[in-house]
Amino acid sequence: MLIYGKDIREQIKERVRQSAEEVKMGLAIIRVGDDPSSMAYVRGIRKFAEETGVKVEIVNLPDAVGERELLKTIGDLNNSSEITGIMLQTPLPASLNASHLVNAIDFDKDVEGIHNYNLGKLISKEEGVRPCTPKAVISMLKAHDILIEGQKVTIIGRSMTVGSPLALMMTAENATVTVCHTRTRNLKEEALRADILVAAVGKREFVTADMVHKDMVVIDVGINFDENGKMLGDVHEEARNHCRLASAVPGGIGVITVAELFDNLRILSQKA
């Protein structure tokens, strides 16, 4: 059975809409190039902003942009009183140092929760802004009354935006967590041990039916596109049909992630 994120999105949207009436909220998005998955994400952000009355400024830069120009753009947004949250859209061209650029964002405007300061708060279990997609995964599981505590959770993917912070957040929920990746030996066997499997590898239909079992909950974080522009997740359709519950793509984690981005903006704006 497929599970969706629309109801969770609507709950967060109402919270954000109310805050937008009370405090100044301004989101800046810096985009480099025209990656299809990032364009889809930005479309979702625009729509959410329109529905909640939040100001969004999008800075579009070419693939060939230099790091110095990007740093200047970030600096200007850091100093803007109209902007309370900044997002650097990834992936970035290989010529740019993503970590250096993300950490140039004022941590008080780090709407994605991936600045080293905010990741440090996650590691030390201090209150702070959490990365959006991991927040979305936890929100989806809890909204559908899926037990996390005591469960075996396998995460395929170890990025600093999804896999690694999600492992910490799942551990904080008292799950037993295994982090895998494309070079994990016996990946199929590791996946099959899971009660909850999270696919965050960024490869189209990477998780196949022989990697899941009928009692498993599968959360698909992936946003990929086929040759015809159809959105596909990291989980193959046959795998979704073979497990107990699976998040939909589209309409699953992606729509909650956008909402969680604005929820983070709400938190930062109230502190500004």
From Swiss-Prot:
SUPFAM superfamilies hit by this protein: Aminoacid dehydrogenase-like, N-terminal domain, NAD(P)-binding Rossmann-fold domains
Reactions catalysed: (6R)-5,10-methylene-5,6,7,8-tetrahydrofolate + NADP(+) = (6R)-5,10-methenyltetrahydrofolate + NADPH; (6R)-5,10-methenyltetrahydrofolate + H2O = (6R)-10-formyltetrahydrofolate + H(+)
Subunit structure: Homodimer.
EC number: 1.5.1.5, 3.5.4.9
Pathway: One-carbon metabolism; tetrahydrofolate interconversion
Protein keywords: Amino-acid biosynthesis, Histidine biosynthesis, Hydrolase, Methionine biosynthesis, Multifunctional enzyme, NADP, One-carbon metabolism, Oxidoreductase, Purine biosynthesis
Role description: Catalyzes the oxidation of 5,10-methylenetetrahydrofolate to 5,10-methenyltetrahydrofolate and then the hydrolysis of 5,10-methenyltetrahydrofolate to 10-formyltetrahydrofolate.
Keyword Mitochondrion set for record: no
Family (UniProt): Belongs to the tetrahydrofolate dehydrogenase/cyclohydrolase family.
GO-annotated biological processes: L-histidine biosynthetic process; methionine biosynthetic process; purine nucleotide biosynthetic process; tetrahydrofolate interconversion
GO terms of molecular function: methenyltetrahydrofolate cyclohydrolase activity; methylenetetrahydrofolate dehydrogenase (NADP+) activity
Matching Pfam families: THF_DHG_CYH, THF_DHG_CYH_C
Protein origin, superkingdom: Bacteria
One term under GO cellular component: cytosol
Keyword Oxidoreductase: yes
Name used for this protein in its record: Bifunctional protein FolD 2
Binding annotation for NADP(+): 157-159, 182, 223
